[in-house]
């Protein structure tokens, strides 16, 4: 075997793009990845398919004189989006698309694994092909199911996300938080229904919910440090069945975004306080359910990230860009809360489309550029 060429990598990416699958359903993707990996040089490579997370793959490249294990993660799932790119290798699965660029992510990981299977690294390298990033918290599942134990426990962890706003092949990163953490909000306001003409005999949940919504909006402006960033969006409200009956139940659904886990927990506490206050004021029951799952803020480790940025800045072949944090979520944040590491951007040069767009069309030249930059950093990191 030889290291996968740029031409071969592009063909791999195009095939992966044709077979997108949703979270925990990535069977065809998994089988194709496994086929490619098994065709690589196996002398120093151990491949594991965990029974507890069967669409995941762990690939461990044994180092020459290992002092540590460096982890590299890629996600493998797709989104329920109908593709509208018109590409000759468009999705073969109706209503499903790699609209977040995970086909690019996987291809870069395969390129790195291909190189290090042929060129044995100094330290151990762990490659984690992770299912269910877009939903179902695949990273958290992997951790809780014990995938990262023994020789598969990384001392530090890295991962990338493609960014259509950045020039193709560029690398973007920052100290601190790269992605916000997210928490789902579900609130049930329960009162007593009644005739619209006799409000004194009912407990109106619509009025209570309306005031609750307004009070929640004060949390960011009055309970959070204005230098920090946080968002509470309540995107769905359901109440009542007919115009002349006071609603006995109102459902509110929304999301929290915060740049640190500390901030998210602070918002959680204030939400509960506000709900309790509305319940008391309007004589209703207010049940608050918060679900963060594995979507913690992606908080880059200071020491490791400083080293990463320093390398990328001094490498004349890398177009490095200091970036701002994004309020979108990424479940690699959970793993970075367990293992020190860094997440970074790979520019894919499609500024006309956003992530999760049905027209996302990454520039394939970014694949080899990304591999070269990351490969160089990993070699430098191992000393």
From Swiss-Prot:
Record: active site: 75, 134
Protein name in the entry: N-acetyldiaminopimelate deacetylase
Matches recorded under InterPro entries: AcetylDAP_deacetylase, Amidohydrolase, Bact_exopeptidase_dim_dom, Peptidase_M20, Peptidase_M20_dimer
Disulfide pattern: none
Functional description taken from the UniProt entry: Catalyzes the conversion of N-acetyl-diaminopimelate to diaminopimelate and acetate.
Pathway per the UniProt entry: Amino-acid biosynthesis; L-lysine biosynthesis via DAP pathway; LL-2,6-diaminopimelate from (S)-tetrahydrodipicolinate (acetylase route): step 3/3
GO molecular function, a single term: N-acetyldiaminopimelate deacetylase activity
Keyword terms of this UniProt record: Amino-acid biosynthesis, Diaminopimelate biosynthesis, Hydrolase, Lysine biosynthesis
Primary enzyme class: hydrolase
Organism: Lactobacillus acidophilus (strain ATCC 700396 / NCK56 / N2 / NCFM)
Alphabetical list of NCBIfam families matching this protein: amidohydrolases
Family statement drawn from the similarity comment of this UniProt entry: Belongs to the peptidase M20A family. N-acetyldiaminopimelate deacetylase subfamily.
Reaction catalysis annotation: N-acetyl-(2S,6S)-2,6-diaminopimelate + H2O = (2S,6S)-2,6-diaminopimelate + acetate
HAMAP family, per database record: DapEL (MF_01692)
GO process terms (BP): diaminopimelate biosynthetic process; lysine biosynthetic process via diaminopimelate
Family matches, as CDD domains: M20_Acy1_YkuR-like
């Amino acid at each position: 075997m030889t290291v996968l060429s740029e031409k071969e990598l592009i063909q791999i990416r195009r095939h992966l793009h044709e077979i997108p699958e949703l979270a925990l359903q990535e069977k065809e993707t998994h089988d194709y990845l496994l086929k490619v990996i098994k065709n690589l040089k196996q002398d120093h490579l151990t491949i594991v398919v965990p029974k507890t997370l069967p669409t995941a793959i762990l690939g461990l490249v044994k180092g020459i004189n290992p002092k540590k294990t460096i982890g590299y993660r890629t996600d493998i799932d797709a989104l329920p989006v109908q593709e509208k790119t018109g590409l000759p290798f468009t999705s073969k699965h109706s209503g499903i698309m790699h609209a977040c660029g995970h086909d690019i992510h996987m291809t870069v990981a395969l390129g790195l694994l291909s190189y290090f299977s042929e060129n044995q690294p100094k330290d151990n390298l762990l490659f984690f092909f992770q299912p269910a990033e877009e939903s179902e918290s695949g990273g958290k599942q992997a951790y809780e199911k014990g995938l990262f134990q023994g020789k598969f426990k990384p001392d530090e962890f890295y991962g990338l996300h493609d960014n259509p706003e950045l020039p193709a092949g560029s690398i973007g990163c920052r100290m601190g938080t790269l992605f916000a953490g997210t928490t789902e909000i579900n609130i049930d306001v329960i009162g007593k229904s009644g005739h619209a003409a006799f409000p004194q005999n009912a407990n109106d949940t619509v009025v209570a919910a309306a005031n609750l919504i307004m009070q929640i909006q004060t949390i960011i402006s009055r309970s959070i440090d204005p230098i920090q960033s946080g968002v509470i969006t309540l995107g769905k409200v359901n109440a009542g069945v007919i115009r002349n009956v006071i609603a006995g139940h109102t459902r509110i659904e929304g999301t929290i975004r915060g740049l640190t886990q500390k901030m998210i927990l602070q918002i959680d506490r204030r939400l509960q306080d506000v709900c309790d206050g509305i319940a008391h004021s309007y004589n209703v029951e207010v049940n608050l359910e918060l679900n963060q799952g594995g979507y913690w803020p992606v908080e880059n480790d200071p020491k490791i990230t400083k080293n990463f940025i320093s390398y990328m800045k001094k490498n004349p072949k890398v177009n490095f860009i200091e970036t701002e944090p994004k309020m979108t979520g990424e479940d690699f944040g959970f793993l970075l809360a367990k293992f020190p590491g860094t997440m970074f951007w790979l520019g894919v040069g499609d500024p006309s489309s956003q992530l999760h767009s049905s027209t996302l069309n990454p520039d394939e030249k970014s694949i080899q550029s990304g591999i070269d930059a990351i490969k160089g950093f990993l070699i430098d990191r191992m000393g």
